[in-house]
Amino acid sequence: MTPATPRADARDNRARIIEAARDAIAAAAPDEELRLNAVAQSAGVGQGTLYRHFPTRADLLVEVYRHDVDELVALAPTLLATNSPVDALALWFDRVAEYARVKRGVFAALEASVWKDLSAHSRGPIGDAITVLLEAGRAAGAIREGVDAHDVITLISFLTRLDESEWEARARPLLAIVLDGIRASARARERGAPTTNGQPL
């Protein structure tokens, strides 16, 4: 077996650092500062390695957020490949709950100018992912007409405002309510359902 090259090792180290930081942010109490020495230890790298990849705490936080956005966006077509549109959207919303928790932790630790810029740049790709899911749902007659990505982003943005004490009890149930709200009515689903000889399949 060919030994890993230094470049591959560096990529692996970077990925482990990002994952360890993400886990730490998700598990942290409100206002708890991300401890870089703990991140390095959890990732199995030295602090020097961490600082070579991320010279400042802000650099690491920004990369954690960007990584989460990339994963969230890529997940939409992956879920549609193996699930019905409504199930894909429900599973995507489940991932949104995790993303929002990390986003809140990242933004709380960054200067306002930084997180506002990050948020502005992520809205487009996330909106595109939502559009893919909504269009698949409408094509199947499962999502109501007139709902667009901006509507969904507005509805799910409440997650970043939930108190930590309410998170486990409210985040996913509230997303389920959002999903119910954008689904087509039973009558509309029947009209949009595939048919055989005029009868729903």
Task: Tell what function each PLM region has.
Residues 1-42:
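Basic, helix-initiating cap at the start of DNA-binding domains
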Residues 10, 65, 69, 119, ...:
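Amphipathic, non-transmembrane alpha-helical scaffold segments
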Residues 11-22, 33, 52-77, 87-90, ...:
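An amphipathic alpha-helix adjacent to DNA-recognition modules
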Residues 44-54:
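Short hydrophobic/aromatic patch on the recognition helix
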Residues 86-201:
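An extended, acidic
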